[in-house]
Amino acid sequence: MVIILLGLCTLGFPRTAFCPSIMTNSTVSINTPPPYLTLACNEKLPTVMSIAGSDSSGGAGVEADIKTITAHRCYAMTCVTTLTAQTPVKVYGAQNIPKKMVSQILDANLQDMKCNVIKTGMLTVDAIEVLHEKLLQLGENRPKLVIDPVLCAASDSSPTGKDVVSLIIEKISPFADILTPNISDCFMLLGENREVSKLQDVLEIAKDLSRITNCSNILVKGGHIPCDDGKEKHITDVLYLGAEQKFITFKGQFVNTTRTHGAGCTLASAIASNLARGYSLSQSVYGGIEYVQNAIAIGCDVTKKAVKVGPINHVYAVEIPLEKMLTDECFTASDAVPKKPIEGSLDKIPGGSFFNYLINHPKVKPHWDAYVNHEFVKRVADGTLERKKFQFFIEQDYLYLIDYVRVCCVTGSKSPTLEDLEKDLVIADCARNELNEHERRLREEFGVKDPDYLQKIKRGPALRAYCRYLIDISRRGNWQEIVVALNPCLMGYVYAVDKVKDKITAAEGSIYSEWCDTCASSFCYQAVLEGERLMNHILETYPPDQLDSLVTIFARGCELETNFWTAAMEYE
């Protein structure tokens, strides 16, 4: 626009019609690095070099490797073996890099740069031969080596595919710290297809590959062969540690998605990065698997239209620098870099209650209804719940409240106003009082006398999942998101007991009656009213285009609360 205006001014148009008569000039002060981050001044970053083909669309190859290595706070170097014109739709063209250039790149990188780990992906015959020479020259000083044998891609794009397979086995796999083949790669390395119908088949493949490739450690990736235990599908990756004659099976959640492009490259790069950071091989593999499964589950939308196999989200855990800069205590450039204005959307909510909108939202309602109509509350109300189940609930709730207090303190630290901070501290204090009540109940009702008993309570799966959720939201989320995550706990107990208030037949003075009375107290009802007002306030200060995030957070909180009570019902 500036160029167009200047052009118009030079063509004889009146200057005042298009150009401002007075030019403004403002000076913006750039902040120094955040104080804590300066502790890492001249940080010695672990270095990882990727030797692989490129993916011009960024989903796989060296592009995926660079993203992955960077996401693991390592320094990425590259040696491109093949240039490709490709997207998740198809490969449009490919051009191998000449052997001389590959050799020059490796020489330059290894001569002038530190290199902790080398990771390989799709290799050409030339690249394998050059790498073999360099590994021999380096001797005992060679970096660790992670080989992702991208054999299907190599055989599909190159007439020398079979040569690549034999050369990998002969020339570089004996130097490798680990090979990470998928099941198709395994068959090509073995020289035969095999039936894979049970875990034992995969174990045998891993052990045979170790022998054939002369590489001690083999990770057989299970993404292409999801297992079914009769209840649900899951992904099974098998790590064979040859020196220890040991298998480690990693069982992960199966995600029904087509966005898996580049997952294999990413896993090998994640393992290489973890090794560069000094983790053991088994730790590095675990970290790589979880990173990739998270990247798949979270996903990303970057293609113009639906594709058969889309890319994964390599940067799901990476922070946006500008967002942190805008909230920095010393940020003074608000005139030059204004914050996005937020228009409240309460007037668009039917009935003017964000809380009521949430509990009736299609994403939330099934979880909310299951929560506030739970059998646990009904059994407490009529006094028929087994005492051991209620004791289990009290013990789990005790540990939950400890984390709840921690989260409230984090919430307070992110509160926008002093009034909000004070409310968060009051809630934390109420939770602390409830902790005291739980201690009393365990002593007086359940005869707990051991002073160390509370420290010995083990966290059940439902509690671990719930606390993990709240703590993660408190660390990564903003004030509004944390408050919404805590809201189901604040509101649900009162609503659940209110539904059975006319059916409370538990003996008066019993622990069940006392619990119901507490949830039905005027204090708790007042807290619910305050909670509804707070939710409306949050809606007014949260970007309307991101409202679905709050819906999802609240729905998940209701689901976790339901699971918490279910765990008590199922305790034996």
From Swiss-Prot:
CDD domains: HMPP_kinase, TenA_C_ScTHI20-like. Induction: By absence of thiamine. One of its GO terms (cellular component) is extracellular region. InterPro entries: Haem_Oase-like_multi-hlx, HMP/HMP-P_kinase_dom, PM/HMP-P_kinase-1, Ribokinase-like, Thiaminase-2/PQQC, Thiaminase_II. It comes from the Eukaryota. The keyword Secreted applies. It is found in: Secreted. One of its GO terms (biological process) is thiamine biosynthetic process. Its main location: secreted. NCBIfam families: HMP-P_kinase, salvage_TenA. Is not required for thiamine biosynthesis. This is Thiamine biosynthesis protein THI22. It comes from Saccharomyces cerevisiae (strain ATCC 204508 / S288c) (Baker's yeast).
